[in-house]
Amino acid sequence: MRLLELKFENFKSFKGHVTVPLGPGFTCITGPNGSGKSNITDAILFILGSRSTKLLRARKLKQLIHGFQEGSKKKSGPKSCKVSMSFDNSDRFLAIEKDLVTFTKGIKLKGKDTTTYYQIDKKKSSAREFEALFSRAGLYATGYNIIQQGDVIQTSLMSGTERRRKIEDVAGITAYDNRLKSTRSTRKSVEADLVLLNERAKESKRTLK
């Protein structure tokens, strides 16, 4: 699986429609301060499902819309933004039977609030479906696929136990353990329901006699 391109529409510093192609051998993005390099990382985190606006360097989701200013009476500015990520999925790393897969996530202003929408290949999707597909592929907004500023120093200051947890996260062990706990919890609930149903069945038989 390889990231082929990113498309922006009024996302943070990217006004209008902007496409960033990521061809074979593409290794870095350079530019002066304030040119939008970090906003590319923010866009990837946004698509991957970051629920923390702090991680996206914004106080509110609406601040991801280009030119948005809280309390501004200006009515001509953008009322929405979106980001699309296209992947080469010829190796079927993503659990979708397509060679090219595009994920789109957007925000729309609705009065003083915002609504968020999700699409896979222009078809309506959900946050849960995004999360499920990305987690199976080992991609997490809060994982270690993306190393942000300060992460290296933070890792060097971790205890042995904290480093082990980090390695388990990268290896997918934590996600597996969470699913295992959820499955066990569901099984216990089902077993409790079966016991209750058996008791009711016995009570019904006694009543019929």
Predicted regions and their residues:
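Gly/Lys-enriched N-terminal cap/neck module of very large, oligomeric protein machines
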Residues: 2-209
